[in-house]
Curated annotation (Swiss-Prot):
It is found in: Cell inner membrane. It catalyses: heme b(in) + ATP + H2O = heme b(out) + ADP + phosphate + H(+). Pfam families: ABC_tran. Its EC number is 7.6.2.5. GO terms for biological process: cytochrome complex assembly. Gene3D superfamilies: P-loop containing nucleotide triphosphate hydrolases (3.40.50.300). This is Cytochrome c biogenesis ATP-binding export protein CcmA. Keywords: ATP-binding, Cell inner membrane, Cell membrane, Cytochrome c-type biogenesis, Membrane, Nucleotide-binding, Translocase, Transport. It comes from Rhodospirillum rubrum (strain ATCC 11170 / ATH 1.1.1 / DSM 467 / LMG 4362 / NCIMB 8255 / S1). It is a peripheral membrane protein. The keyword Translocase applies. The gene is ccmA. SMART domains: AAA.
C-alpha cells in the first residue's frame, strides 16, 4: 500500500493556487491567452488539447520555468513571481523527459531529490517500494529502460514531499500496473490536501478533476500582434 507523506510533511501548507488571464508567448507566437484557473487544496486540473495547444508550456509556466507575457499566478493570494525560490520548494515539475543522472545508481537518483527536500532515507525506501524499484536500486541510470526511468522519476513524488505536483505526460512508458500505482498515489496526495495538474494523452483516473481544454484559449491574433508591436516600440 502506498502511503505518501501527509500534509504535515509538506515544506509549506497547501493554499489556493490560481492563475488570472494568462498569456503565453513562445518566440513570436502566442500559444494561449486569457487562461484562468483556481486550484484549491485537494484539487486536480486535467489539461487536454491537441499537440501545440500549450499543455507543456502551461505546466512550465506554472513551475516558473517560463513567465507569462501577461496575467499572473498567485499562491494564497500572493504573487508567486515575488518569491520564485519559495514556489520552487512547494512544487514538483515532472516533465516528459526523465531527469535521471546516467552515472548515478537508481537509488542515488531518488535520494538526490529527497536530500533537496530535507527528507530522509525512509522516504527513499518508500518511494522505491511503491514503484517496484527496490530490486534495481544499485543499477546505474544509463542502464534503466524507458519505463524504469519514468518510474524512478515519479518516485521522487514520494521521496520529496511537495504540495503541488505538475505532471507532463506522466504515464509515458508505463504499463497499466504502474499507471494504477500513480493513480493511487495521486488520490492519496489529494486526500492529504495536495494538488495536481496533469497533462496526458492516455486514460488516467482523476475523480473530480477540473478539465482545462487548452484549445479553448487559442489566442486572438490581433492581441498577440499588438504585444509584439509594443515590444518593438
Amino acid at each position: 500500500m502506498i502511503v505518501p507523506p501527509d500534509s504535515a510533511g509538506f515544506p509549506e501548507a497547501p493554499a489556493i493556487f490560481a492563475g488570472e488571464d494568462l498569456l503565453c508567448v513562445r518566440g513570436e507566437r502566442a500559444i494561449f491567452a486569457g487562461l484562468s484557473f483556481r486550484l484549491a487544496p485537494g484539487g486536480a486540473l486535467l489539461l487536454l488539447g491537441p499537440n501545440g495547444s500549450g499543455k507543456s508550456s502551461l505546466l512550465r509556466l506554472l513551475a516558473l520555468l517560463l513567465r507569462p507575457a501577461a496575467g499572473r499566478l498567485t499562491w494564497g493570494g500572493q504573487a508567486v513571481a515575488a518569491d520564485p525560490e519559495a514556489h520552487g520548494g512547494r512544487c514538483h515539475y515532472v516533465g516528459h523527459l526523465d531527469a535521471i543522472k546516467p552515472v548515478l545508481a537508481l537509488r542515488e537518483n531518488v535520494a538526490f531529490w529527497a536530500k533537496l527536500a530535507g527528507a530522509g532515507e525512509t522516504h527513499v525506501d518508500r518511494a522505491l517500494k511503491a514503484f517496484a524499484l527496490a530490486p534495481l536500486a544499485t543499477i546505474p541510470g544509463r542502464m534503466l529502460s524507458a519505463g524504469q526511468k519514468r518510474r524512478a522519476n515519479l518516485a521522487r513524488l514520494i521521496a520529496a514531499p511537495a504540495p503541488l505536483w505538475l505532471l507532463d505526460e506522466p504515464t509515458t512508458a508505463l504499463d497499466r500496473a504502474s499507471i494504477g500505482v500513480l493513480e493511487d498515489l495521486i488520490a492519496r496526495h489529494r486526500a492529504a490536501g495536495g494538488m495536481v495538474v496533469v497533462s496526458t494523452h492516455q486514460d488516467i483516473t482523476l475523480p473530480g478533476a477540473t478539465v482545462l481544454a487548452l484549445d479553448h484559449f487559442a489566442p486572438d491574433p490581433s492581441r498577440a500582434a499588438g504585444l509584439f508591436l509594443e515590444d518593438e516600440g
